[in-house]
Amino acid sequence: MIRFSVIIPHKGPQWQLDRCVASIPQRDDLQTIVIHDEEGRGAGWARNQGLSQAEGSYVIFADSDDYFHPCFNGFLDSIKEETADVIFFNADSIAMESGKPSWRANHLNRIMHSSDPVWQERHLRFHFTEPWCKAVSMSFIREHAIRFNESKILNDIYFSTQVGIFAKRIKVYTDKCYCVCNHSDSTAKSKKAEDRMLDYTRETAKSNLLLAKYGIKRYHSRMLRPMMTAVCHLHLGSAYKCWKEMRICGYSIHTLLYYIIRYPRDLMKLIIRKAQAGEIVKLQIGN
């Protein structure tokens, strides 16, 4: 019986995919699904294709340039009888070029190491929007018809927001079973700057509206980041396009003005929090 399905979107160097696949333990209860995105449709499309092929009770997502640590096998053993909707596990990160520790998993580490279980659960549900380090129940996914948006960047945020909203029972394992590889030529960074800004704005806006629909009083302040960055650089045409994207998504002028007024405060809180945690402050679009 297939218990786990690991889905890997692939568009990049073959050696990275080979390393990722080789890090997945050989088990009779595990299915590895590689979706080759030769036409550049995006990781969201590839993950949706993988979901349609998944036979496991739980699905786990990996990026082809990342890999699993040996403890991943023990993690799978420990959750064989689990019935939670989503099971979170931890990660570390390295810089691809130097092999030195990187910042990409710092936000997850901070959540995992929190001594406040209420804060931890809220942040895992609504702040940790990456698809990796989650084992998500396939029956839960089917019940709520959860899928990835097929944008070129941030295609995972709407999926993760739905998982966070609808999951009735979650479990947390703090072992670092996954390694996130940070490198300079990622998909998010290689896309045309203005297209990236608009995708970024659109996907965070959709996520915010979904949270509001279910009465969750928080919003991704980074929704405004592309527009505010464009304003600061006097790229007013790009800023207006971002504004239009948020209006098309359904935001009223009054709500957007309210968010703009509070944005400097939220940005400062983010910088202070990251500085206190010893994290590198990364505010580029797409990170």
Label every model-predicted segment.
Residues 11-12, 24, 37-41, 64:
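Conserved short acidic donor-positioning loop in nucleotide-sugar-dependent glycosyltransferases
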Residues 2-5, 23, 31, 158:
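Cell-envelope/extracellular polymer assembly enzymes that use nucleotide-activated donors
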Residues 64-170, 181-195:
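Donor-binding/catalytic cores of nucleotide-activated saccharide
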Residues 176-184, 189-217, 236-249:
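Catalytic core of nucleotide-sugar-dependent glycosyltransferases
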Residues 38-54:
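Glycine-rich, basic loop-to-helix element that forms the pyrophosphate-binding segment
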Residues 8, 12-26:
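Short, well-formed alpha-helical segments that are part of the catalytic scaffolds
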Residues 59:
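Short aromatic/hydrophobic "clamp" motif used to bind/position activated sugar donors
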Residues 19, 26, 44-45, 84, ...:
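Membrane-interface aromatic/basic loop that binds lipid-linked glycans or pyrophosphate carriers
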